[in-house]
Amino acid sequence: MTQANNTVYTDLSVDDLVKEALQRGEGVLADTGALVVETGHRTGRSPADRFIVDEPSTSAAIAWGPINRKFPADKFDALWDRVEAFNNAQDHFVSYVHVGAAEEHYLPVKMTTQTAWQNLFGRCLFINPAQYNPAGRDEWQVLNVANFECVPERDGTNSDGCVIINFAQKKVLIAGMRYAGEMKKAMFSVQNFLLPAADVLPMHCAANIGEAGDVTLFFGLSGTGKTTLSADESRYLIGDDEHGWGEGVVFNIEGGCYAKCIDLSEKNEPVIWKAIKHGAVLENVVLDGNQHADYADVSLTQNSRAAYPLEHVAKRSEKNLGGEPNAVIFLTCDLTGVLPPVSILNNEQAAYHFLSGYTALVGSTEMGSGGGIKSTFSTCFGAPFFPRPAGEYAELLIKRIKGFDSKVYLVNTGWTGGGYGVGKRFSIPTTRGVIAAIQSGALIGAETEHLDIINLDVPKAVPSVETELLNPRNTWADKAAYDTAAKGLAGLFIENFKKFDVSDAIKAAGPQL
């Protein structure tokens, strides 16, 4: 379709999107065939530039604050028109995709991007249906115009870029953002608001299935191991980041994966390694003189990424869904070296740690956090993406866990034997051993040891994991230093949890001083 002197490219094939991106100088090819692009000064999400339109139909249901920032409806309309006019004056790309693999819960989305590579990214991460919108639902629009520059004084934005969600109009406006992760997380936020009304728990988690049909969920912030640990050659991948849990089903909200690439190796992450080929997008990955990706080079960012469709994963769930989970794993990257490699949680502890979302920002996906790592609490293991009050998601989680009798575990992928800079990080093989034990059922009914202060129960033995690692105090040379660190971490948990209005049973399930 042609408008004035420009062309609208609609539903191009992957091959054609790659060709357009190369012809327009948007990226180059790696030796694997993946398209390599740079995103400029924004190499992660920009949470200070994310807004939700404040309008009557949803205003009372949203937890407004520093994460969910209000944007005036009239300002949104003016800015949408301005960005759309800017985009319509030049070539752009349109694809029709779905968000949500379950037939009852998909959203039809018209995705419009200024660049070919961001359209390819959307085709990697969203679902490319055999038939678009068979149920005839109202369509969502994503308008992503990377080279538009917002003017805060005129547009009401925080900077030269913005991400704005309008639930009433079913629109997502992304302007001035070359980092493509904003697009997937915006639609995740949309589903995170909509799904609870349908009695579905939206989750920032990965999911996979065993040969026997058993499903495991991996909750966790970026860098804690969701993508790596769920990409298991012995199991079928459902997805690596965004899922819904309804009665009888866990389904992927997406159709692809968005893997961190820092220090990626074929040995430790063979599934991801093999998926980075023609049709995949590498963001902010440095190539050597032979067009070979140097995943150890962090000169552009520690948050280098690979986007690829699930079709690039040989062993996957064909329909992007599975049954309810036998095992629910909360991944935490503990910088203090206090938490054990695995703890077995009861329902109240599950609610406590889900609401707390304790972990570290590791090679953070957020702008302004720098390359360093620091401890953080992120409610629901994904606070930036959940528009409703946290308690609503926690109630749904407990309802689902009780309904299916799912077993819940807290797994530390962080430090042992001392805090960051003193101890060492658990190796991926060690953590994989913990995960394998959980998935085999070996920890159900296992004999446990109670850890005071942090108030957790740890198994006394885990197949293929060194027994001395299981009680973290034993891994510290200075036991008194461990006790001091444990009290310090408990204090952080207690202070963070003061903001939650929950039952005494849930409050008592956390660390105690």
UniProtKB/Swiss-Prot annotation:
Localisation per UniProt entry: Cytoplasm
Listed cofactors: Mn(2+)
Positions with a binding annotation for ATP: K185, H204, G220, L221, S222, G223, T224, G225, K226, T227, T228, E269, R305, T431
Enzyme Commission numbers on file: 4.1.1.49
SUPFAM superfamilies, per the entry: PEP carboxykinase N-terminal domain, PEP carboxykinase-like
Cofactor note: Binds 1 Mn(2+) ion per subunit.
Metabolic or biological pathway: Carbohydrate biosynthesis; gluconeogenesis
Family to which this protein belongs: Belongs to the phosphoenolpyruvate carboxykinase (ATP) family.
Function: Involved in the gluconeogenesis. Catalyzes the conversion of oxaloacetate (OAA) to phosphoenolpyruvate (PEP) through direct phosphoryl transfer between the nucleoside triphosphate and OAA.
Name of the protein described by the UniProt record: Phosphoenolpyruvate carboxykinase (ATP)
Provenance organism: Pseudomonas entomophila (strain L48)
